[in-house]
Amino acid sequence: MACRSWVLGILLVLVGCAGPEVHQGEVTTVVIQPVQEQADIANEPFVLTGRLAVNARQHRFSGGIRWQHTGQSDEIYLFSPLGQIVAEIFRDQTGVRLVTSEPAIYRAQNAEYLTSQVLGWELPLAGMRFWVRGTHFPDTVAEKDLDKNRRTVAIRQDGWQVVYQNYYPAQEGMSVLPRLLEFSRPDVKMRLLVDQWQGETKSGDATGRKLP
């Protein structure tokens, strides 16, 4: 019963998060061309914890997520509603490794292929490490919708649409970070609710933000 209530809680929160939606008022659309230089944001570390709901054609997932990112690596843990690890995804310069709860270990050169083959839905890690921070992947063309405060409302890139439904309130010395996002393409829809961000402030000090 507790498990069912936990899952229902995830779905209710991910369907409608309290707080104002960001896509209100006038929106400006810009097209951004690829750049050869790697964006500095790619090297900025972060840790996020939250809840993820995935609805693919034949596969679904609802549970927790913990994602630790550095410029050289990613570690992503997916959890069941009861807190058990469902999958561990590791990326470094040698490729990507996915460990399931059996346990079984799978390897590939990119997370997109590996997750689609093992989990049944694609985790677009190359773009997602930028999208979760409200910006575009610099290697390919992106179409970006901005509100009057130049905050990202939506990104369309590499066949994906990312919609930013809620942000953390702005705080002095910190960048504005997304709170509730939706990633979609015709065969899959994902909703991510970030419960807590940890990273670096503009002054270089460690910081964390948590939902009220």
From Swiss-Prot:
Record GO cellular component, one term: cell outer membrane
Question: Biological process GO annotation list?
Answer: lipoprotein localization to outer membrane; protein transport
Quote the Pfam families the UniProt record gives.
Answer: LolB (PF03550)
Alphabetic keyword roster: Cell outer membrane, Chaperone, Lipoprotein, Membrane, Palmitate, Protein transport, Signal, Transport
Lipid group attachment sites (S-diacylglycerol cysteine)? C17
Tell me how this protein sits in the membrane: Lipid-anchor
Please give the superkingdom of this protein's source.
Bacteria
Q: Which family does it belong to?
A: Belongs to the LolB family.
Protein role? Plays a critical role in the incorporation of lipoproteins in the outer membrane after they are released by the LolA protein.
Protein name as annotated: Outer-membrane lipoprotein LolB
